[in-house]
């Protein structure tokens, strides 16, 4: 499967992790293995690798959401969460976080199309950022508490 740290398809294990960080503290809270769709469809291969029959393919964003929900059920409060474009490019993930009233800052692919709450399409990120002047960029404060 694709191994991001190696930059190529490789024999590797891919995991999804949930981490918690403050200026003074950081730790991994939870993690789960990602089983590629090709593996999930090949049950004899899974059995040979010791993967139980009940383990099925789940997209990484769904695994991340399950880890998040479990942490929240255990009383962990996240003021903000961040993620890379592998998750930010999945509208289902963004909608699920919004439905949970979770604040987030995420990377999105340059081909991502942004939209408004009423379904209005703004622009693809690539074209929107190309049109923006250097003076239009600013740091946005993210202070406040959701917990």
Where are these regions (language model features)?
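A short local loop/turn or secondary-structure capping micro-motif enriched for an aromatic residue
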Residues: 36-40
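Active-site-proximal, Lys/Arg-enriched surface segment
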Residues: 1-35
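An internal, acidic/charged active-site-proximal segment
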Residues: 41-147
